[in-house]
């Protein structure tokens, strides 16, 4: 049964934060279940979110909620074990809207690190705004 793999021990990093204002637009806001807070990247292409889980996980689904006009157009998912180089898992193409979107991952390998790369954005300046990010799957016990 798939469950959220994001927990207090999950470490996250992002490519940038708008104006370095982490108090208002920091990465933690993707995981706080508050529909009024968000991570807002600075401008530039290839923005990303990197997650490191406390143990190996089998990812079955990625859920993202963008702000319309600031969505990823072409995205890729990469993953690896803790000390390995990231490997390509999947390309996906979100719609430019405010809805929670779901991207199933068929035959996902066991990973401990997961990177979502927003290769380009619907925003002219390349900014990405994410209100919700959740990773579903199973923990490798």
Swiss-Prot record:
What keywords tag this UniProt record? Nucleus
Single GO cellular component term: nucleus
Q: Where in the cell is it found?
A: Nucleus
UniProt KW Disulfide bond keyword:
no
Q: Return the Gene3D superfamilies for the record.
A: Galactose-binding domain-like
User: Which source organism?
Assistant: Danio rerio (Zebrafish)
- Can you say what this protein is called? Nuclear receptor 2C2-associated protein
Q: Which superkingdom is the protein from?
A: Eukaryota
Family the entry assigns? Belongs to the NR2C2AP family.
The record's SUPFAM superfamilies line, in alphabetical order, gives:
Galactose-binding domain-like
Q: Which gene encodes it?
A: nr2c2ap
Record function comment: May act as a repressor of nr2c2-mediated transactivation by suppressing the binding between nr2c2 and its response element in target genes.
């Amino acid at each position: 049964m798939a469950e959220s793999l994001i927990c207090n021990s999950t470490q996250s990093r992002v490519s940038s934060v708008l104006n370095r204002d982490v108090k208002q637009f920091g990465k933690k806001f993707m995981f706080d279940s508050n529909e009024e807070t968000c991570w807002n990247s600075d401008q530039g292409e290839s923005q990303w979110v990197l997650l490191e889980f406390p143990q190996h996980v089998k990812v079955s689904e990625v859920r993202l909620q963008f702000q319309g006009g600031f969505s990823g157009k072409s995205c890729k998912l990469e993953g690896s074990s803790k000390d390995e180089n990231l490997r390509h898992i999947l390309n996906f193409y979100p719609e430019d809207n405010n809805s929670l979107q779901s991207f199933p991952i068929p035959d996902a390998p066991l990973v401990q690190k997961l990177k979502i790369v927003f290769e380009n954005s619907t925003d002219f300046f390349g900014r990405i705004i994410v209100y919700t990010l959740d990773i579903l799957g199973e923990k490798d016990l």
